[in-house]
Structures are given as C-alpha cells and as structure tokens.
Design a protein with these regions (language model features):
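AMP-binding (ANL) adenylation modules
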Residues: 107
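Charged, gly/pro-rich active-site loop segments
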Residues: 23, 27-38, 111-184
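Short, basic/aromatic recognition patches
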Residues: 32-53
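Short beta-strand segments
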Residues: 50-84, 92, 99-104, 112
Length: 184
C-alpha cells in the first residue's frame, strides 16, 4: 500500500499548498518582491533624481570591476562618458555585459534602487561624444543652461580622448522599501 496521510490507510486528494498554514485559495499572495518593485514611472523618476551609478563590468581577472560614474538617463537607458583607454572600456570591449546600480537611502526602510543588467554599446564618434559631454555637463553643472566659451572649449579638448557608453537594459530588479510601511 502507498504512503498514508495523518495515519489513515486511504489516500486523501489534496494539493500541496493546502498544507501551508494560513492558506486561503481566495486570497492571492503578493510576494515581497512584487510589493517593493518600482513601477516604470518610479524607475524613471529615480534615474532622474539620482546622480551616481555604480557601473560593473567583468575585469581582466574575471572579478567584477565596479566604478561610480555620473550618468544621464535617456528613455530608460543609462549613458556615461569615460576615457577611451580606461579599464571599464577595455572590459566592455571584451564583454559588453554590465550591471548598473542606482540606489539611495541610508536606513533599511528608506532603501530604494534598481540593478540594471545591460548590454554596453561604446560610441567613439567625436560628434556623438561631444554632444553627450555637453548633456552630461548641463545635468551636473548648477546654474547654467548652455555651454559657451571656456567650458565648451574644455569639453572639445577632452572629447577626442573619451567615449560615450550606452547601457541598454536587458533585465531590471528594483526595490523601494518605503512601500513596506515599516514591516519587514
């Protein structure tokens, strides 16, 4: 004879979930992950608000190479600029897979962020690099709305040594612990 339930000799047809304490087929369970996930609008707002992203690529010895970078969000994508001969560029030339982390909050109940798995696309065209450099500078410079004179000349001098990198999201995990309402 087969296995018995609760010492009975006959099999009782039950689904495994009926044995969980508190199970109710009429009340759908919401996972914590779904509860704290950012909506598309919340994610875009976070990317607009925050100023530093941690960009991680695979280093030459196979370990993560993570660097803080200023960035510009463009329609859900992350763009940065860096020196063309930097380690992160060498890493992304070898393997374009990257993870970009944008987060904020000091206390657990304040934590909010997104971990974006992405494919990196390196742009070397001087016009593209310069246009992006201007956009990045305007995002971070306070009190200016246009680049002129010495500021523009400085960017033009740096652009030939730089690249712009576009991170196209493949998968995003996000969280906003404020949505937990103090319960953990």
């Amino acid at each position: 004879m087969g296995p018995t339930l609760a010492g009975q000799n006959a099999r009782v047809a039950r689904t495994p979930c009926q044995f969980r304490p508190g199970f109710s087929p009429k009340v759908p369970r919401v996972s914590r992950r779904d509860q704290i996930k950012l909506s598309e609008e919340e994610l875009l707002a976070l990317l607009e608000e925050e100023r530093v992203a941690i960009v991680s690529s695979q280093g030459p010895r196979g370990r993560p190479h993570s660097m803080p970078m200023w960035f510009v969000p463009r329609q859900g994508e992350i763009w940065i600029w860096t020196y063309a001969r930097s380690q992160k560029v060498k890493n992304l030339e070898r393997d374009p897979r990257a993870t970009v982390l944008v987060e904020t909050g000091r206390e657990y109940q304040e934590l909010r962020g997104a971990s974006i798995e992405a494919e990196a696309e390196i742009h070397r065209d001087p016009a593209t690099v310069l246009a992006f450099a201007e956009e990045l500078t305007l995002r971070y410079a306070e009190g200016i709305s246009a680049l002129e004179g010495d500021a523009k000349a400085a960017l033009e001098a740096q652009a030939p040594k730089r690249v712009a990198i576009r991170f196209k999201p493949v998968r995003t995990a996000s969280w906003d612990h404020r949505k937990l309402g103090g319960t953990y």
